[in-house]
Amino acid sequence: MTTKVIMYGVGQMNMLATRLLKERGIDIVGAINRPGPKIGKDLGLLSGIDYLNIPISDNPEKVLSKTADIVIVAVTSELPIMFPIYKQCLEAKKNVATIGESSSFSWRLYPELTVELDNIAKAYGVTITGTGAQDFGIVHLGILM
């Protein structure tokens, strides 16, 4: 059984993640973005790979109702801004991984919000992991230059 993923945010980071996930045979089942010119476009074509038949949606409820193991969130960094998105994903019984820097060690920066997210995740039997994107520049320095 392959891992099923929803992409939340279709900027540069999640377009890169889309390419990497597809290279590894991961099944992307949905894509969410804010209203704008990307809505309705195919995630694969927008990410520079083959057509995936995954239209980008501005309807999180609809996309989060799909069967998926994890939502990869790459929208913005600040936990107070991201809290409603994380909460929505967790309440949809989806595991969450985010590159938001303030989520990489949120216990120190935003203890109250972190406790609340932790409690929500536990209540729904899912997890939330903040990785941060701090290593991105170093890891890809050779490519970027």
What is the predicted function of each stretch?
Residues G137-M145:
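Oxidoreductase and adenylate-handling cofactor-binding alpha/beta cores
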Residues I81, K87, A92, E101-G125:
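Rossmann-fold NAD(P)-binding glycine/threonine-rich loop
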Residues T98-I99, I128-G132:
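General beta-strand structural signal in soluble alpha/beta enzymes
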Residues E23-I49:
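NAD(P)-binding Rossmann-fold cofactor-contacting core
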Residues P60-I70, L79-E101:
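Rossmann-fold NAD(P) dinucleotide-binding segment
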Residues V75-T76:
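Short glycine-/small-residue-rich Rossmann-like dinucleotide-binding loops
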Residues K4-A17:
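Glycine-rich adenosine-cofactor-binding loop
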Residues P55-N59:
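Short acidic-hydrophobic, aromatic-tinged amphipathic segments that line or gate anion-handling sites
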